[in-house]
């Protein structure tokens, strides 16, 4: 066994009919985690329903349907491998909760793959003014997804026309530039997801195509296929060197062991012997042990779902939504208020100061008041349009001062991304999403346990 490949997360974006499912399905199918039996079963069903030609998309539709019915399908199905990476497709948009998932993102994407339909008229529809594509690309960029690959799909429908491809590259370069990406760092790859052309092996249909190239930190990388472009993603920097932030998902009381908080390490590391602080509870104590899947861990790192045992803390003192951090290294604190950039997605009316919906930020679920609408901004450029607007409505972006109804721990997105983005829920749907720009932290002295005092003396 060589060293385990690095894991990367990709998100696939693009217009409804750009062929995202077929393309993603094809990658998973050819390089992926779907076992032969499942594939044969799907193929048989697809053939019976006369959808044989659709088999790659069909694979994905099956997975999606099962996912939406709440059947947790083996997430391995959404994985595939390149020579360098284990790739996980963390979401395929078109999925109705795509925007919410991107925001509360169970995981941060390292790279976005934008699929553009090359067909006549299709391309134009896909990136028109109100296009979804723009929205998804903008969202990816706003949420810190800094790497992008553009796949120009359905090249078979325009007979692999070189001029068409170049025209699309020119237009798309302008488009991604407006969103914030530097086109020189973006590989543009012509493909046919339907035929699987130029996805994994270089196509023989476009002798004119010399391959893609992109600028990287180290210089330049080149290749021909989509798989090579994914393999050329810059290795992600995992936030192990940041101070610890671990939002609690649950707190258990386990006989003979005591209090065991459980959650995912978002940044930093957690290990036995550390003195940690829970915010906004304001409790400081020592970590006795850390485990994952019932095995002791030397340390938990970002991405690990861990349980850890703490001394002298009762289950009543800490709860889901609290954040655990290192008491000696930028410990987490509660906040009195925070300022965020909020984009209203679908609200039937107008939102004005005083509006108090529920915010989902990391694992916290707390009502927050829109205290002051500070400015309205153009969501395409980020430029200010007016100061202190009276209200905002669907489609608007604004800077808002928010006040939580009870103690809450959040962070600026630039410091700790997973704790700096949120979804606004009201009327059983996501009405807005936001990114936190700054936080007014509250300083309250909390409880320091005997275990923590003892550990501090060591």
UniProtKB/Swiss-Prot annotation:
Region: G1, residue numbers: 14-21
This protein's record includes keyword Ribonucleoprotein: no
Residues with PTM N6-methyllysine: 3, 30, 316, 390
Chain positions with N,N,N-trimethylglycine modification: 2
Residues in tr-type G domain copies: 5-240
Localization in the cell: Cytoplasm
Keywords assigned by UniProt, alphabetized: Cytoplasm, Elongation factor, GTP-binding, Methylation, Nucleotide-binding, Protein biosynthesis
Signal peptide start and end residues: none
Modified residues (N6,N6,N6-trimethyllysine): 79
Entry annotated with the keyword Amino-acid biosynthesis: no
Sample GO molecular function, one term: translation elongation factor activity
Main location: cytoplasm
UniProt GO cellular component terms: cytoplasm
Region (G3): 91-94
Residues binding GTP, per UniProt: 14-21, 91-95, 153-156
Region (G2): 70-74
Pathway: Protein biosynthesis; polypeptide chain elongation
Modified residues (N6,N6-dimethyllysine): 3, 316
Annotated segments matching region G4: 153-156
The family this protein is said to belong to: Belongs to the TRAFAC class translation factor GTPase superfamily. Classic translation factor GTPase family. EF-Tu/EF-1A subfamily.
NCBIfam families per record: EF-1_alpha (TIGR00483), PRK12317.1 (NF008969)
Function: This protein promotes the GTP-dependent binding of aminoacyl-tRNA to the A-site of ribosomes during protein biosynthesis.
The protein's name in its UniProt record: Elongation factor 1-alpha
Organism name: Meyerozyma guilliermondii (strain ATCC 6260 / CBS 566 / DSM 6381 / JCM 1539 / NBRC 10279 / NRRL Y-324) (Yeast)
């Amino acid at each position: 066994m060589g060293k385990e490949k690095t894991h990367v997360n990709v998100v696939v974006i693009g217009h409804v009919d750009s062929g995202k499912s077929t393309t993603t399905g094809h990658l998973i199918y050819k390089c992926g985690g779907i076992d032969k039996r499942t594939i044969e079963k799907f193929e048989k069903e697809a053939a019976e329903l006369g959808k044989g030609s659709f088999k790659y998309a069909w694979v994905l539709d099956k997975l999606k349907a099962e996912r939406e019915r709440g059947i947790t399908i083996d997430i391995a199905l959404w994985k595939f491998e390149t020579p360098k990476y284990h790739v996980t497709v963390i979401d395929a948009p078109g999925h109705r909760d795509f925007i919410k998932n991107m925001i509360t993102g169970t995981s941060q994407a390292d790279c976005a793959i934008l699929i553009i339909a090359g067909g006549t008229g299709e391309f134009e529809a896909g990136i028109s003014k109100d296009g979804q594509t723009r929205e998804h690309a903008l969202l990816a960029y706003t949420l810190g997804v800094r790497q992008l690959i553009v796949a120009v799909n359905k090249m078979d429908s325009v007979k692999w026309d070189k001029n068409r491809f170049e025209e699309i590259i020119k237009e798309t370069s302008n488009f991604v530039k407006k969103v914030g990406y530097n086109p020189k760092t973006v590989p543009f790859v012509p493909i046919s997801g339907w035929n699987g052309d130029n996805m994994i092996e270089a196509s023989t249909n476009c002798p004119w195509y010399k391959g893609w190239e992109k600028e990287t930190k180290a210089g330049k990388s080149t290749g021909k296929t989509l798989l090579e472009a994914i393999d050329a993603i810059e290795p992600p920097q995992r936030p192990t060197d940041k101070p610890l932030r671990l939002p609690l998902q649950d707190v258990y009381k386990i006989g003979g062991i005591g209090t065991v908080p459980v959650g995912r390490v978002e940044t930093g590391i957690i290990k036995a012997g550390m003195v940690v602080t829970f915010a906004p509870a304001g409790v400081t104590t020592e970590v006795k042990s850390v485990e994952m899947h019932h095995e002791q861990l030397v340390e938990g790192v970002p991405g690990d779902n861990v349980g850890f045992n703490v001394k002298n803390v009762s289950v009543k003192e800490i709860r889901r939504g609290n954040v655990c951090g290192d008491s000696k290294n930028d410990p987490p604190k509660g906040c009195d208020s925070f300022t965020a950039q909020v984009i209203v997605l679908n609200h039937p009316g107008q939102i004005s100061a005083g509006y108090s919906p529920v915010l989902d930020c990391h694992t916290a679920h707390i009502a927050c008041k829109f205290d002051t609408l500070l400015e309205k901004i153009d969501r395409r450029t980020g430029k200010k349009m007016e100061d202190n607007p009276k209200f905002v409505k669907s489609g608007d972006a604004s800077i808002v001062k928010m006040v939580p109804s009870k103690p809450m721990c959040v962070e600026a997105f630039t410091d700790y991304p997973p704790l700096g983005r949120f979804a606004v829920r009201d009327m059983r749907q996501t009405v807005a999403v936001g990114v936190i720009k700054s936080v007014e932290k509250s300083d309250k002295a909390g409880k320091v346990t005997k275990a923590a005092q003892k550990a501090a003396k060591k």
